[in-house]
Amino acid sequence: MAVSPHISPTLSRYKFFSTSVVENPNFSPYRIYSRRRVTKSHLQAHNSTTSYGRTELSSSKKLWIRQRSFSEMEVEQAQLEDDEEQVEIDIVDEASLLSLSMKPDRNMALLDDYEMEELGHTPNTHHRSGYVAVVGMPNVGKSTLSNQMIGQKISIVTDKPQTTRHRILGICSSPEYQMILYDTPGVIEKKMHRLDTMMMKNVRDAAINADCVVILVDACKTPTNIEEVLKEGLGDLEKKPPMLLVMNKKDLIKPGEIAKKLEWYEKFTDVDEVIPVSAKYGHGIEDVKEWILSKLPFGPPYYPKDIVSEHPERFFVSEIVREKIFMQYRNEVPYACQVNVLSYKTRPAAKDFIQVEVVVDKNSQKIILIGKEGKALKTLATAARLDIEDFLQKKVFLEVEVKVKENWRQDEGLLKYYGYGGQIRAM
C-alpha cells in the first residue's frame, strides 16, 4: 500500500491517502444510477385505506441499472495510476436525488405498467408491498435486524449507541412481496444538540410513512414501558399503524426468562404482537417477516426487485468511513464527527478517486483523529478503504482529511446541508 501523509505547520489541514497496488479484476458488472422522472397520468392509488391521509404525487424516483463490461485491456489499464483523465461519476447530481422533506418516499408513485414490462415484472393481484418503520431506543439492534431482513449490510453496525443518524431505506423483495424498511436513529429522551432533534424528526417521518411499525427492545434488560419510544417515534398520529414488538438478543438469556418477559410485554404494552428474536444470528427473522407481510397492503412493487436501497453510492461510502470512526475511537469523538464525500471520480485508466472530509467540533478532536505522526488517521483510512472496495467491488484511491467547524451539531443550516433536515444528499 502506498501512503502519502501530509500535515501543515498550523494543523489546519491534514490529508491521508490510502490506495492498494494490485487491482481486482472482479468488477461488479452493474452500477446503480439515481434518476428522478415524471410519470404519466396513469398513477395508481395504492390501497388508500392504509395510507393514513397521504396522497400520491405525480413524480417518482427510479433506480436505473446500467450494465458495464470491462475488457481485459481495461482491467490492465485500471492498474495504472494515471491521474490525467478524470470523469465525474454521474450519480453526484444532487438534483437527481429525491427530497425526503418535500416528497416522502411513501408518496412516490408506483412503477407503471411500462416500467414493469421493462423489468420483466408480471402483474400479480396477490402481491403485497409497503413501508415498515423500525424504531427503538439506542443500541437495541435495529440496524442488525434490518440488515438480516434485507439479506445484506445496508446500515452500519457498531457496539456504540446512536450509530444510525439518518433513516436508512432498505428493500427486501421476493416474487410475492416487497418490504421497504426504514432503519431509524435510536430514540433520544434527552436531546443535547440540534442534531438530536433533527434525528428524532427522521424517526417520526418514518412512522408517518409506514404501513406498520416494528418496535425493538433489548431482551436482556428489565421490561419497561415503551411509551417514550411511541411518543418520540410515532408522535401524535391520529391513527396508529399496526405495531409489532420485537424482543431482540434472546440468545443472551435463558428460555424461561424469555417467556416471562414476553408475557409482561403482551400484558403491559399496546402492541399487536410480541416476537423474540436474535437479530445477530437470524433467529426469529422469518416470524417477523411473516407478521409484517400480513399487514402490508396488496399492490405492485415500488422498486425493481433487484434493488436493495435507493441511496447513492456516495452516501454508503460516507457511512462506511463513519462506521470505522465509531469502531476506532472512543468517548465523544465519534459523535462529534460528520463525514462528507467531497469528490467521487471514475478514472478509466486508474483507480476511482474518492475524497472524504471528516468534520469535527473542536481542534482537540481533530488532533485525536489524526494521532501521533498521522498514525491514527492512517489506520482509519486503510480500514475504510478496504470496506469501500468490498462494497463497490473495485479498487479505489481514498483521500481523507479532517476539518474543524465549531458547533456544527447546533448549526441548523449546516445540518440541513448535511442531510439531517429530511433530505438524503450525496454527501
From Swiss-Prot:
Q: What does this protein do?
A: Nuclear genome-encoded probable GTPase involved in ribosome biogenesis in chloroplasts. Plays a role in 16S rRNA maturation in plastids and may contribute to the assembly of the small (30S) ribosomal subunit.
Ranges for region G5: 277-279
The species is Arabidopsis thaliana (Mouse-ear cress)
Task: Please verify whether the record's keywords include Plastid.
Answer: yes
The record's section on InterPro entries has: G_ERA_dom, GTP-bd, GTPase_Era-like, KH_dom-like_a/b, KH_dom_type_2, KH_sf_prok-type, P-loop_NTPase, Small_GTP-bd
Superkingdom, natural source? Eukaryota
In the record, the note on similarity to other proteins reads: Belongs to the TRAFAC class TrmE-Era-EngA-EngB-Septin-like GTPase superfamily. Era GTPase family.
- Region annotation (G2) maps to 162-166
Under which name does UniProt file this protein? GTPase ERA-like, chloroplastic
- As listed in the record, the transit peptide stretches over 1-39
Domain Era-type G, which positions? 128-298
Q: In which compartments does the protein localize?
A: Plastid, Chloroplast stroma, Chloroplast nucleoid
Q: What Gene Ontology cellular component terms go with this record?
A: chloroplast; chloroplast nucleoid
Q: What are the binding positions for GTP in this chain?
A: 136-143, 183-187, 248-251
GO MF assignments: GTP binding; mRNA binding
UniProt xrefs under HAMAP family: GTPase_Era
What keywords would UniProt list here?
Chloroplast, GTP-binding, Nucleotide-binding, Plastid, Ribosome biogenesis, RNA-binding, Transit peptide
Region G4: start-end pairs: 248-251
- Region annotation (G3) maps to 183-186
Disulphides: none
Q: What region holds the KH type-2 domain? A: 329-406
